């Protein structure tokens, strides 16, 4: 089974992924969605004895906390990077710029 805990700023995306998994035929309970802030929802997952591996994308500071708390669990991390952003030829450039700035700086880590 897998547990998905996405950013608290994107709860609808996480919920939709869960719905799509069910629609694709993945049995209930195989993909589990958890909503909440990192300290409240993420830390208990990192510490839980039944969690064998952790994949995390976010800030270096949070990654360091996960490494300290994870013990001997396997982990994969993408830390401190910037989000890729595709702007198509027919895009409204003012809206695209606003969206890029929002996504880069509003969901850091």
Question: Where are these predicted regions, by residue range?
Answer:
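Short beta->alpha connector loops at strand-helix junctions that form conserved
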Residues: 5-7, 35, 88-89
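Hydrophobic packing residues within well-ordered alpha-helices of enzyme cores
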Residues: 14-17, 45, 66
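A structured beta-alpha segment of the ubiquitous adenosine-cofactor-binding alpha/beta core
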Residues: 32-55
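ALDH superfamily catalytic-core signature
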Residues: 47-48, 53, 61-109
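Residues that line or immediately flank small-molecule/substrate-binding pockets and catalytic motifs
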Residues: 58
């Amino acid at each position: 089974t897998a547990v998905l805990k996405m950013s608290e700023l994107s709860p609808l995306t996480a919920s939709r992924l869960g719905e799509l998994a069910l629609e694709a035929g993945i049995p209930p309970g195989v993909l589990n969605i958890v909503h909440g802030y990192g300290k409240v929802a993420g830390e208990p997952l990192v510490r839980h004895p039944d969690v064998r591996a952790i994949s995390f994308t976010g800030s270096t500071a949070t990654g360091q906390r996960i490494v300290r708390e994870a013990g001997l669990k396997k982990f994969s991390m993408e830390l401190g990077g910037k989000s890729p952003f595709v702007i198509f030829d027919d895009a409204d450039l003012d809206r695209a710029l606003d969206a890029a700035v929002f996504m880069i700086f509003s969901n850091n880590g």
